[in-house]
Amino acid sequence: MKKIFISMILMLAPLAAAFAQDVVGKWKLEDGSAIVEVYQQGDVYNGKIVWLEKPTEADGSPAVDDKNPDPKLRTRQVLGLNMLSNLKKGNGEYSGGSIYDPGNGKTYNCSMKVEGDVLKVRGSLDKRGLIGRTMDWFRVKE
């Protein structure tokens, strides 16, 4: 009986690991324009842009955050920019944080949920997530 119990535990361990989906890693945006690396910092999760489809402007200079509402930040490079901030893990999702869109210079409330190799990222105007949109990001296998 003891051997059967141990065998069952050994067989179920990989299954449990599969259900414990981790958000940490690299994710490609649904339009393929960027890759964001999600990382844990203390008890929160953040994400920075680590790859851009178009990393430079037409003149060859690095793409910058030119739509930022803060004029002092409009010269910072988009590559390396933190776009996900302060997401906390709880109840199978990550929430309570924000997502910054360098395409329009706006910051939205954010929640995320891992579904296999897809990260469902919801940006919304309200904290409950009622007014917004959900994007699918795809895990980058290394």
Each model region followed by its residue ranges:
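Portal/gating segments that form or line small-molecule/metal binding sites
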Residues: 109-114
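Structural recognition of beta-strand segments within beta-rich domains
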Residues: 28-29, 129
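Edge beta-strand at a domain terminus
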Residues: 118, 126-142
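Ligand-binding face of N-terminal immunoglobulin V-set domains in extracellular IgSF glycoproteins
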Residues: 122
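Sec-dependent N-terminal signal peptides
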Residues: 6-9
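Positively charged n-region of N-terminal signal peptides that target proteins for export
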Residues: 1-4
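Central antiparallel beta-sheet cores of small beta-barrel/beta-sandwich binding domains
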Residues: 24, 30-35, 39-100, 105-108
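Sec/Tat signal peptide C-region and signal peptidase I cleavage site
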Residues: 15-20
